[in-house]
């Protein structure tokens, strides 16, 4: 950020500035001496006016390339160079891999692979008379430019091969390998290892480890062990270059929360060819840098996979058919030759040899013989997409897109909720056993019959959700902890109910609506109002009956019914759950089964003419037993009089003048006349009839 301009230095005019390496943005890895305090000293033979980048050896380019997942072979300098070589039709210069073996042997040493399904190939080579020191400036500079710090010459060589060849490598200090052997096996249950970053991990049989004769010394494909790391005193090393099963490395890295450069390479795929090439390159560098001497003791355990090219025959006409253009045979041969596929054309048949490093092109099974789309992709990306001409369909039937009834109903439901000021939330489709315990569900509850995920993101997300209530309660708790003490949320998502475990068929996947409200102004009747609004928006009617649920208040919970079918529930969260989640306000939960509710999606609305006569309203307060529900009272009122249009509960009261064990509930009852206006006497008779029915049915009295 310093601007260099004309100034005076000790009384003399100066048009430049003497800089340190730090001021130029250089580090010790990029240029020797740049990391020290003081001015950066350049070579004595440097010419005035020369470009500093050239003098410091930094006249280089760094490419930031976004790779697609199907091209793991391009995760290296060599892989990109192959592509550039094919595009520019320039010869590929392979890294030097020659070295000289001495007659020295590591007597009695052996290598075993006990889990060949997880380790198709394992190579090891013994190097002695090792001298640990700094890497040369050119190597440190190149490593720094690709984001890696120099450590020591031996370790730097393994990192250099990783970036250059794309082959993860590791070096063991032989003085710490006990039992004179290396064994590749599955870890034992609860076996432990301390990795190079001094973190201890507990493993299981799903993890692959590299062991000596006594203990694990590396977590295969992820990181080496601290007990065999390269030290300043190291005198002999055993180099490892292997191919590990990508799925196993991915699962191990995620389960242990251990992502490394090596695991990233293995997860995308490393081929057998790179295993051999990487080892040869590392040994060449050891010899070139004078770091050690290469012995004749080496091992290459191969389970039968070959690094020879795999033949493949496809139809030229099918390749052109996929592309929609005619690519000349000469062009196809040229392109495939440049890509190192050794092509031959005989009539309509194109035969190619797929190199081992192009695993994305290899047949995946005996029936995987029609790979012409892959060949077409290789041809067109080199031939040029600009050769593909615009074409129009000769005839096509245009259909209008749109939502089906279920999608329309779900969208309308969401809009209804949003108009009520309820915010939509989204959660993971997973939860944990702790969430089921939070809901205090009994052991035989269907919600506890949850599908376990084989490879969970973490243990808190190890089960497929069987209810949305736990996620909503946790969301309310998180909001309150962040200082939001009131709010309304909803989520529409799927739950998964298996018929039995372990799974023998697809689970019952159901869309569910979950609404959560919290705050000092929220109540049971708020949630009931939300439910009624949903029903009104669909031109249906909900009825409510008391229900007992382990996570809801025993007297403030109801099940929701529509035409006699149970479609959900709502109620106040139980006090012990609110306390467990440290909630500071009351919270309410509702779940509606949208699979059941979808029966009424798209229902045709029926309209009635507006009455010519004025509606009559009466406020009625009743005294009743505490165990009588609001729904029972409302249903009884409707049965007593056919002119009842609407019933609204506006007050519930206990104590004072109300006898013990009783409560008062006050309703606004609206009567809608149809044929004639109602006078006072007629409405009074309606009220008397309602009171009589309530008295007979529930021993309910009109409050004076």
Predicted regions and their residues:
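RNA/tRNA-interacting regions in translation and RNA-turnover enzymes
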Residues: 1-406
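Glycine-rich, charged/polar anion/phosphate-binding loops
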Residues: 3-4, 48-52, 110-113, 193-197, ...
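Short flexible coil/turn linkers enriched for glycine and charged/polar residues
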Residues: 10-12, 35, 57-59, 118-121, ...
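Glycine-rich active-site loop/lid that clamps phosphate-bearing ligands
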Residues: 21-46, 325, 329, 486-488, ...
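Flexible, glycine/charged-enriched surface loops at secondary-structure junctions
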Residues: 91-101, 150-155, 286-299, 344-347, ...
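Beta-rich nucleic-acid/ligand-interaction surfaces
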Residues: 99-103, 353, 397-398, 402, ...
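Extended, well-folded interaction surfaces typified by the phenylalanyl-tRNA synthetase beta subunit core
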Residues: 312-485, 618, 670-672, 682-704
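A carboxyl-terminal module marker
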Residues: 338-345, 360, 364, 499-502, ...
